[in-house]
Structure formats: structure tokens, C-alpha cells
């Protein structure tokens, strides 16, 4: 490769990345996932597109995709709160194992019939597209206010279900090739245990070692993110080499680093944010270049049937069976979880396996995987907002600071500087600073007005467009958001948590007359917490609702995983009119 070729490679690569970035706003205008834009740019630059670039190197595509996926999962793990495992761990594990197996089987049966394949070939297609994709799920759910039970289940499932899909894919390839003659049930069981066991062990152990190394070494600030990524990739590669799941390992590494006091954590997250975007762009550009759109035309009709069969039939059945033991999920939540079974890069990466193994019909498997991914991103990803509304899993948006920066004055500092800009509909406009009920231990470090720094006192009144710099910790974010909150834009969300709020420990007898409750003798001594547990079980989350005594009750506040307030929503004329219609 001469200098001109290398320079052309840099020029084309940089142009494609820049074009992807500049076209990214199109996704919000058209209501399509941004990942689809990156994929489309790759396809337009490819063999059948305007660019005419011929790219068919599956080994390079496999390398780029795995590297990108590892970075995306490391970042996703660091941003996942361990607290979410309280309500979502076991449902996620069930979906990541039983759910993937059921989806694989049902999709495989459809593929066998639609494409006249052998049963094992059809099930291989099912295994390739059987798992949800972490890159797609993390990207589409980022910044959305979702019921914790649902959002956490989807994120943890997408980060942990790849080992099952990889295990099934590799096993079926071995059976279909000459190397599968010596396979036994014991060997398969051992392989399954190795995938999950080694992946989990190296993820936790390697993550703990990396955490110690980061905290014990004093380095220039910019090197901590490089150490984190390189350490994560070492564990990712080592896990794969030992027969484990590198994908699971690096997700757990991120989870451990993100939930422990890690030196320069905020700086690491800022760098990872940019690296994750670059990884997503690079991965989907390469996968777009790899496909030949003209080859998809011949499978368009049966491919659509397979994609919609998986979306409307296989995925919902697998979710309902997988979540059967978990009574806390409502039918609406199960429906939403089944709808957000997004497919992305992972199925396309798994479709490269048969190509590299030289299996017959490998090109068909790849084209089918690509087709299913495109349909999933367009149909499921494009309707996500509407699905949230229909399933009623959307929570009122929590006002976020316009900027937040770590104040890392010592290695394990949890202090941050939150920046808020006050708009006209902020409820604290016109209030003197002394009247603000700031969370204990927090301070307003600075106030800017008309781009000038003020010297505020307790009598300083806040005005529209003031910028506040607040020194606090992440645990204070909810209280600060409430203090500097603005009215929800959607009218349907203004009464979401109720018209009146009751303490969870209030006695029913004390409020029965006020709210028209009809209490029998057995309810006289009960508290509201008893009713909540009877209706929602022991792990309710913010936004959970139930109807009791003709009224709608909503979990309105949760502190340290304990319900503290319940909202009472009274029926109004508009709601009654809608019900009559």
C-alpha cells in the first residue's frame, strides 16, 4: 500500500464520518434512529451507491465491529446504575437466556419455511438475529424518561444477551460444518457454562483489578480514559481467548468502574462519550459498505415476512414466556419490552461467522440479518416514542442541567458542578436565594446574568435567563431538578403523578372521609403502604399505577428504593369523556 492509497483511505474515511455527523439531525426530523442514518451513508458510499466503493473484506468488518461494540458496551456499563439491578436483574437474565432461545427457535422455524432451508440452517438464521443489540438500545433509550423497571430491563438484557446468541450461532455452525461430528450434549453444556461463567468471572475480577490500577496510579488526566479503554479491551480479548463472552466481560467491567469511586471518572465518561459516537458511526458505516443492496431485492418479500414475523410473533411470545415468573410487569409493560427488541450491529456481526466458516448459503444468512436489522430499526426504532405513549411507560421528563462537570479535587471525589439556565416557566423565578430549599450540603457557587458574574446575597432574586452554577453530588440531582424544574410540555404529563400526594405511612382511616374511601372493618388499621404492597408487590418503581376504590394511585416519590409518597389522581371531565368515547 503506497502513500497515495493511504492518503485516499484517510480522505474517504474522514469524509464519510463527517457526512454522517452532519446528517445526524435528519434522524430527529424524520423520526428515525440515528444509527439508520449512519448505515444509509455507508450503503450510499458502497458498491451500489453513489460512491461505488467495493468493500467485501469480512475480516476487517468483523474486527471493526467487535472493537466498536466493545467500546459501546464499556460506556453503557459505566452509565448503568447498579441500583437498577434491584428491579431488573432476574427479568433481564430470563430474557437474555430463555427469551433468546425461544426467539431463535420460532424465527428459525419461520426461516426454514420461507426460504426452504434445512431445519438446522433455519435455526442458525434465528440464532443470528435472536439477540437485541446494545448499541441500538443504548442509543435509542438514552435521554428518555422511562419507567425504571422497563428501561433497566431493556438495557441490562441488551448488554447480557449476546453470549446466548453467540453460543447458539457457534454451536450450530459447528454442527453444520465437518467440525460438528464430535459434539455431545456434555460438550455443549460446558461451552454454554464457559460463555457465561468465564465472561462474568473475568468481567468482575478484571474490572476490580482495573479499578485498583486506575486509583493507585497518578497520571495526567487525559491518560485515565486511555487506560480504561485499553484495560477493558485486554479483558474483552482475554475472555474471548479463554472461551468466554468478551461482550459480557467488558460490559461488567464498565458496570464496576461506573459504580465505584473511580479516579477521574467524569473525565473518562466525557472521553468515552465521543469514542462511543465514533464507534457507532464507524461500525455502521463499515456494515453499510459491506452490504450490496441489489442482493437484497431477491429476498425482499420473504425477508419482510421473516422480519415482521419475528417482531410481531417470535419476540412477543419469548418476552411473555420469559417474564411469566415476574408478576410486577403489567401487560402494557410486557408489550413495550417486546416491541423494543431492537436489532442492530450484533446480528450482522454474527452473520459474518458463517461467511468466515465457509458454510453454504452464508451470503443468504448475511443478507437476511442485514434485512432484519434494517426493518427493526425503521419499524421498531421509528415508532419508539409512539409505543412509549401507548404503553404508558413514559414518565414526565426530569429537567437535566445543561452541563455537568466533575470537580475532582481528590481521587474519589463525587462532587460535580451542575449548570442550570432558568426559563420563564421555572417555578423559582422571582424567588430570593435564601428561600430556596437547597439539598443539604449543596451550594450555589455562582450566578450569571446577561453574561456577567453576579455577587449574589440571600436577597438576590432569580430572573429569567439567569445561569446558576450549583456545587453538589449526583445523589442531589433529583432534588435539584425538582427545585429548578419547569412544567412538563405535554398536558397529559402535568397530572401524571396525581392531584394530591399522601405519605406512604398514612393510615387509611385518617384520609377515608376526605377522599371518599369505603373502608371495611379489615382496612381500618391498615396504612397506604399495605395497599401498595398488595397491589404492586414489594418492588414498585416511580410511575407505577393501580386503580383502587375507583381512584387512580401513582407511585410519586422513591428514595433509596423505598416509596415515600403516593399520588392520588382524581378523574376529570376530559378523561371521563375519553372513556365514554
UniProtKB/Swiss-Prot annotation:
Any one biological process term the GO annotation gives: cell volume homeostasis
Recorded effect of pH on activity: Active at alkaline pH.
Xref: PROSITE patterns: RCK_C (PS51202)
Top-rank lineage group of the source organism: Bacteria
Catalytically driven reaction(s): K(+)(in) + H(+)(out) = K(+)(out) + H(+)(in)
InterPro entries noted in UniProt: Cation/H_exchanger_TM (IPR006153), FAD-bd_PCMH-like_sf (IPR036318), FAD-bd_PCMH_sub2 (IPR016169), Na+/solute_symporter_sf (IPR038770), NhaP2 (IPR023729), RCK_C (IPR006037), RCK_C_sf (IPR036721), Transptr-assoc_dom (IPR005170)
Membrane protein topology class: Multi-pass membrane protein
RCK C-terminal domain mapped to chain residues: 405-486
Location of this chain's protein in the cell: Cell inner membrane
GO molecular function, one term: flavin adenine dinucleotide binding
Keyword annotations of the record: Antiport, Cell inner membrane, Cell membrane, Ion transport, Membrane, Potassium, Potassium transport, Transmembrane, Transmembrane helix, Transport
First-listed, main subcellular location of the protein, grouped into a coarse class: membrane
Family, similarity comment: Belongs to the monovalent cation:proton antiporter 1 (CPA1) transporter (TC 2.A.36) family. NhaP2 subfamily.
Biological function: K(+)/H(+) antiporter that extrudes potassium in exchange for external protons and maintains the internal concentration of potassium under toxic levels.
Protein name: K(+)/H(+) antiporter NhaP2
Amino acid at each position: 500500500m503506497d502513500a497515495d492509497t493511504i492518503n485516499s483511505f484517510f480522505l474517504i474515511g474522514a469524509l464519510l464520518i463527517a457526512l454522517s455527523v452532519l446528517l445526524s439531525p435528519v434522524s430527529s426530523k424524520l423520526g428515525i434512529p440515528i444509527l439508520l442514518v449512519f448505515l444509509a451513508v455507508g450503503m450510499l458510499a458502497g458498491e451500489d451507491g453513489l460512491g461505488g466503493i467495493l468493500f467485501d473484506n469480512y475480516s476487517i468488518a468483523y474486527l471493526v465491529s467487535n472493537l466498536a461494540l466493545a467500546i459501546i458496551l464499556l460506556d453503557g456499563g459505566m452509565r448503568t446504575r447498579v441500583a437498577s439491578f434491584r428491579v431488573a436483574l432476574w427479568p433481564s437474565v430470563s430474557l437474555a437466556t430463555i427469551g433468546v432461545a425461544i426467539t431463535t427457535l420460532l424465527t428459525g422455524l419461520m426461516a426454514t419455511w420461507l426460504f426452504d432451508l434445512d431445519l438446522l440452517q433455519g435455526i442458525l438464521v434465528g440464532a443470528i438475529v435472536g439477540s437485541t443489540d446494545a448499541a441500538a438500545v443504548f442509543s435509542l433509550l438514552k435521554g428518555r424518561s422511562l419507567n425504571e423497571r422497563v428501561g433497566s430491563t431493556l438495557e441490562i438484557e441488551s448488554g447480557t444477551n449476546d453470549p446466548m446468541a453467540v453460543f447458539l450461532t457457534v454451536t450450530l455452525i459447528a454442527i453444520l460444518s465437518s467440525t460438528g461430528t464430535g459434539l455431545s450434549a456434555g460438550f455443549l453444556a460446558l461451552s454454554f457454562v464457559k460463555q457465561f461463567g468465564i465472561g462474568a468471572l473475568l468481567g468482575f475480577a478484571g474490572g476490580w483489578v482495573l479499578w485498583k490500577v486506575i486509583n493507585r496510579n497518578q497520571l495526567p488526566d487525559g491518560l485515565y480514559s486511555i487506560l480504561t479503554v485499553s484495560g477493558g479491551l485486554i479483558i474483552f480479548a482475554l475472555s474471548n481467548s479463554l472461551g468466554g463472552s468478551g461482550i459480557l466481560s467488558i460490559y461488567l467491567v464498565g458496570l464496576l468502574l461506573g459504580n465505584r469511586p473511580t479516579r477521574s471518572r467524569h473525565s473518562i465518561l466525557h472521553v468515552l462519550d465521543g469514542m462511543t459516537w465514533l464507534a457507532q458511526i464507524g461500525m455502521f458505516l463499515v456494515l453499510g459498505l459491506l452490504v450490496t443492496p441489489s442482493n437484497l431485492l431477491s429476498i425482499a418479500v420473504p425477508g419482510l415476512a421473516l422480519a415482521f414475523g419475528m417482531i410481531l410473533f417470535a419476540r412477543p411470545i419469548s418476552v411473555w414466556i420469559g417474564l411469566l415468573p415476574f408478576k410486577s410487569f403489567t401487560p402494557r409493560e410486557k408489550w413495550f419490552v417486546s416491541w423494543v427488541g431492537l436489532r442492530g450491529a450484533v446480528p450482522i456481526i454474527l452473520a459474518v461467522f458463517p461467511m468466515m466458516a465457509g458454510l453454504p448459503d452464508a451470503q443468504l444468512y448475511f443478507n437476511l440479518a442485514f434485512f432484519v436489522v434494517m426493518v427493526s430499526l425503521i419499524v421498531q426504532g421509528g415508532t419508539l416514542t409512539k409505543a412509549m405513549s401507548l404503553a404508558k411507560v413514559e414518565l414526565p421528563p426530569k429537567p437535566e442541567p445543561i452541563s455537568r462537570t466533575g470537580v475532582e479535587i481528590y481521587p474519589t471525589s463525587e462532587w460535580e458542578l451542575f449548570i442550570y439556565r432558568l426559563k420563564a416557566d421555572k417555578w423559582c423565578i422571582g424567588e430570593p436565594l435564601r428561600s430556596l430549599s437547597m439539598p443539604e450540603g449543596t451550594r450555589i457557587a455562582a450566578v450569571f446574568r446577561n453574561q456577567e458574574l453576579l455577587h449574589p446575597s440571600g436577597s438576590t432574586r432569580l430572573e429569567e435567563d439567569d445561569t446558576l452554577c450549583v456545587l453538589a453530588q449526583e445523589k442531589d440531582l433529583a432534588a435539584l431538578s425538582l427545585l429548578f424544574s419547569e412544567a412538563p410540555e405535554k398536558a397529559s404529563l402535568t397530572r401524571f403523578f396525581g392531584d394530591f400526594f399522601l405519605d406512604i405511612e398514612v393510615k387509611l382511616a385518617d384520609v377515608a372521609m376526605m377522599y371518599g374511601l369505603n373502608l371495611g372493618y379489615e382496612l381500618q388499621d391498615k396504612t397506604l403502604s399495605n395497599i401498595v404492597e398488595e397491589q404492586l408487590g414489594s418492588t414498585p418503581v416511580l410511575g407505577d399505577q393501580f386503580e383502587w376504590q375507583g381512584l387512580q394511585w401513582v407511585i410519586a416519590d422513591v428514595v433509596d428504593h423505598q416509596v415515600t409518597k403516593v399520588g392520588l389522581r382524581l378523574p376529570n371531565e376530559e378523561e371521563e369523556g375519553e372513556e365514554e368515547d
